[in-house]
A protein has these predicted regions:
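Short amphipathic alpha-helix initiation/capping segments at coil-to-helix junctions
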Residues: 134, 175-182, 204-212, 257
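Eukaryote-specific, cytoplasm-facing alpha-helical/coiled-coil scaffolding segments in long proteins
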Residues: 166-173, 240-248
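Amphipathic alpha-helical interaction surfaces
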Residues: 29, 147-151, 168-171, 191, ...
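Basic- and aromatic-enriched surface patches that contact anionic nucleotides/nucleic acids
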Residues: 1-163, 243-254, 258, 269, ...
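Terminal end segments
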Residues: 258-264
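C-terminal hydrophobic structural anchor segments
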Residues: 196-243
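Small-residue-rich helix-loop
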Residues: 156-197, 201-204
Length: 280
């Protein structure tokens, strides 16, 4: 098992910051609340609980040791983040969202996770199970908040930009104001962007990040300018201009980010009407 990472408190208690899911899974298994399935090699264990193992095998399992990296309570968030990244350098590299979840635990990231579980939001953002399990919903939520506040300050690399935003919000953030911003955006998208919402087409199982950023932040900026906005249609989603702005090429370019976000804003506000379509 990979190293576990924990923080040592004032009374030497350990709080796991990386590996809690592994520990919980082991506890569930040893308590007979988890049944093995989907094993490709040890197929004879499929459908079996811990108590189904021979006594000798159970004892050997329980005697296996764990390896811990212990971080003192004096370590700064930056040090914790650095340690977390260093111990997660296996071939199955953590996503930026997974790293952030372990490195920046606190009220703000708890809020990001809370928003990511919103049923309306998940309905608007189709996603594969593997993406869901690797923190993609949290990634999208964080991008919405970070870009809606600071897209004009974005330079190039998204990951460090988001990390900096999280660290700033860990110190102070207006939870209710941000929750309202997120909820209002989702409600608007659900009402006016059906049936595709953030996907390219109905029944898609993918939510492209560049498309999500453009629509979500563009909606927020348009509503900020006109809270009573009721667009006639969103046909511009099918325009050549929008498709060009939401391709993945140069997606991390600050000029492209600004362009696609403000394009959506201006289309919603009726400031862009002379657009080109495939049949033009």
């Amino acid at each position: 098992m990979p190293f576990l990472v924990s923080i040592s408190g004032e009374e030497a208690e350990l709080e796991i910051i990386d590996g809690s899911q592994r520990i919980r899974t082991l506890v569930e298994y040893c308590s007979d609340r988890l049944i093995l399935k989907g094993l490709d090699k040890l197929t004879s264990l499929n459908g079996k609980k811990f108590s189904d193992l021979p006594n000798g095998r159970q004892n050997k399992f329980l005697l296996r040791d764990f390896r811990f990296h212990v971080v003192t309570e004096k370590a700064t968030p930056e040090v914790r983040a650095d340690i977390f990244k260093r111990v997660n350098t296996s071939s199955n590299k953590l996503t930026d969202s997974e790293t952030r979840k372990g490195a920046y635990q606190g009220p703000f990231y708890d809020f990001i996770i809370e928003c990511s579980k919103d049923q309306t939001f998940q309905e608007l953002c189709p996603m594969s199970e593997s993406k869901k399990g690797r923190g993609e919903y949290e990634e999208l939520v964080l991008r919405f908040f970070a870009f809606s506040e600071k897209y004009l300050n974005f330079k190039h690399d998204v990951a460090p930009f988001l990390d900096t935003f999280v660290k700033e919000c860990q110190k102070h953030f207006d939870k209710e104001k941000m929750r309202e911003r997120f909820s209002t955006m989702c409600t608007f998208v659900k009402e006016y962007f059906a049936p595709t919402y953030f996907a390219r087409k109905a029944n898609d199982s993918v939510t492209p990040r560049v498309r999500f950023e453009a629509i979500s932040v563009g909606v927020y900026l348009a509503l900020k300018e006109n809270p009573n906005l009721k667009p006639q249609n969103v046909n511009w989603l099918m325009s050549k201009e929008f498709k060009e702005k939401t391709t993945s090429d140069a997606s991390n370019n600050p000029g492209r980010l600004k362009s696609r976000i403000e394009f959506v804003r201006d289309c919603l506000l009726g400031k862009k009407t002379d657009l080109n379509y495939e049949n033009n």
